[in-house]
């Protein structure tokens, strides 16, 4: 819904949506319900079960599975079932119940924040495409980057799926190409793809590395990780990651969550591994319900993210990784 980009749903409208949404009707779109006493029961849509333990209470306006614990009001149900954000679920219900959404205009400050965020995502998309192109079509990309991924045993379809790339040895190759294409220096710096030197030169943060884009839950590129391949220069950090930014808060993101969320719901379990390549290797061997916290222990924000899909987290750190 790009139509809604610049607006917010006001509280009065939210209240009207919540009042109108009949929990039994909302759940019935997805679950076959039978009346039992004052409530309704059905098979839980969030885990596999033979005996109905999913209960819906019209009087309370709530649903709950007594086996897996998932549930809540109509909005929570739609968020969980359709993997929607809170505003998306509200819009879904507004549409179902023909409620017109009166949206307040954003303040100029809010508009600026939003257009900054959009510009940053656009720059990140450009960088992802740029790194992917180098991996496939540039001589170093193929002989160094692609060779490394092939040596790890990664298939081409997996390399494409995770949008892997390569950055050349040039210290400002990305910066120059981006400026030439009309991207603003401001956003190259804000995303952390580039930085300014003391004498005001624009330099790339990532060079001579294989590149791993980090995706949000909805598949947008928020950050990058780059791994150095040459071993001669011992001073180089093995991994370089995007710095925190307006769009990237490391403690709220998990590598691979976008590619894993459906499998996590289906298997009702999430495997947590250490690094990017562990996630990719497991996908390639058919295990898709896997994410990486990139070496750090799980933050409360990351745990909340996983808990949107399952309560079961299994940690597979070095030693367990076959």
Q: Where are each of the predicted segments found?
A:
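Positively charged, low-complexity/disordered segments
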Residues: 1-2
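Phosphate-handling DNA/RNA-contact segment within nucleic-acid enzymes
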Residues: 9, 21, 36, 112-122, ...
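Short, conserved phosphate-binding/catalytic loop or strand-edge motifs used
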Residues: 61-62, 95-99, 107, 146-151, ...
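Non-catalytic interaction/clamp surfaces of large macromolecular machines
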Residues: 111, 115-160
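Phosphate/diphosphate-binding loops
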Residues: 318-322
């Amino acid at each position: 819904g790009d139509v809604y980009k610049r607006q917010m749903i006001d509280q009065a409208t939210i209240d009207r949506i919540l009042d109108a949404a009949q929990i039994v009707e909302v759940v019935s779109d997805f679950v076959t319900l039978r009346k039992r006493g004052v409530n309704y029961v059905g098979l839980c849509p969030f885990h596999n079960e033979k005996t109905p333990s999913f209960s819906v209470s019209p009087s309370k306006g709530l649903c709950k599975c007594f086996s897996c614990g998932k549930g809540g009001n109509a909005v929570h149900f739609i968020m969980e079932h359709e993997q929607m954000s809170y505003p998306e679920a509200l819009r879904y219900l507004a549409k179902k119940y023909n409620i017109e959404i009166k949206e307040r205009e954003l303040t100029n400050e809010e508009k600026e924040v939003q257009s900054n965020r959009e510009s940053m995502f656009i720059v990140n998309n450009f960088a992802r495409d740029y790194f992917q192109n180098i991996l496939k079509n540039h001589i170093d990309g193929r002989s160094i980057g692609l060779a490394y991924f092939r040596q790890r045993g990664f298939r081409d379809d997996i390399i494409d799926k995770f949008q892997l790339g390569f950055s050349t040895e040039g210290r400002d190759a990305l910066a120059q190409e981006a400026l030439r294409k009309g991207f603003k220096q401001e956003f190259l710096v804000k995303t952390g793809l580039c930085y300014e030197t003391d004498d005001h030169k624009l330099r790339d943060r990532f060079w001579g590395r294989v590149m791993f884009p980090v995706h949000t839950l909805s598949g947008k590129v928020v950050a990058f990780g780059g791994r150095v391949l040459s071993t001669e220069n011992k001073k180089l950090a093995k991994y370089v990651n995007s710095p925190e930014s307006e769009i990237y808060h490391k403690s709220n993101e998990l590598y691979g969550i976008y590619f894993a969320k459906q499998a996590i719901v289906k298997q009702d379990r999430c495997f947590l591994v250490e690094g990017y390549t562990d996630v990719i290797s497991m996908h390639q061997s058919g295990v898709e319900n896997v994410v990486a916290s990139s070496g750090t222990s799980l933050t409360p924000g990351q745990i909340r993210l996983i808990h949107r899909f399952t309560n079961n987290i299994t940690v597979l750190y070095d030693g367990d990784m076959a």
